[in-house]
Structures are given as C-alpha cells and as structure tokens.
Amino acid sequence: MIILETARLTLRHFEPTDLAPLFELYRDPDVRRYFPDGTRTLQETREELEWFLNGHPDRPELGLWATVERTTGTFLGRCGLLPWMIGGVPEVELAYLIDKRRWGEGLATEAAQGVLRHARDTLRLQRLVCLVMPGNAASLRVAEKVGMTLEGEHCDEFGTCHVYARSLLGHAVAET
C-alpha cells in the first residue's frame, strides 16, 4: 500500500520481497556507520522486516516505509515515523536511510519532506523530532533542510544523540 509519493519517490508499506534489498542496505558498514548496533545479519534484517510488516502495536499509523524510485520501483531505502520517549515525553521521530549508491542526490531530503507533509496533513501531528548521532553530518543536513533545529541531547541504551525538532503547526513544507 502506498503511503505517499513525491516527485521521484514512492513510500509504501514493506513487502516480504523487500528482504533482499533491505539486507543489502543493512549489511553495508558505510550505511550503518552511525547506528549503535552496526550492521545487521540476514536474520536480524528478517526480524526487523517482520516488525515493519506488522506495524507498531500502539501506533499503527506510524512506521518505516520502503522508499522506492517512482519510475522504476527500485528499492532505495526506508523513511518514516517512529514513536520514542525522550526525557519522559512521547515524541515521533522522522527517520531516513538511503542506499549509499544514491547519496548526494537529495533523495533523503525529498523523502523526509514527503513524510513531514504526511505527518502534518494526514496524521495531524504537531511536532516531529530527528535523532542524529554525533558526527553524522549528512543526516544533520537533511534535518536542517527540512526545517529542524537543534533542541538538545538524548541519552538511552543506544548512546547519546542530538535531538533536532520542528513544529508542524502553521508551517509549510518545502516541495522538491
């Protein structure tokens, strides 16, 4: 099922056939460099894909969605919305991950802008956060390009990350 489309991308629910390209993405150390748990095995990827397929039990409207090229259907990565507790406050994180062969094309920014619009217009969310690991300059640039600003730091079992945030109330989202 399609969640949203942008000029170049389709974000859709994951399908079982996405396992192979998702595993290719997850086993790449460059792509997973800023993930505290590093690369993933095939079994770990399969388990995560099952979570994507079943959705979040408490927030089924949220999730990470397969991000594919609109014209070819080529799997490019994943982008979406995840529930988090930050400092005891429930938040929704905008998360994105694109195949390194397509880095530098603005695809993560385009996907993130589409998800921001979906969060504001369809889900009626009032605010989003983005959790950026220290040193991840590319992810930081995407967060800033979609209008997020540094709000502080968050520490949990995964480590310390920078929290970028953006209100969705009364704000337009740039088109790509």
Model-derived features with residue positions:
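Conserved acetyl-CoA-binding loop-helix of GNAT-fold acetyltransferases
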Residues: 104-118, 137-145
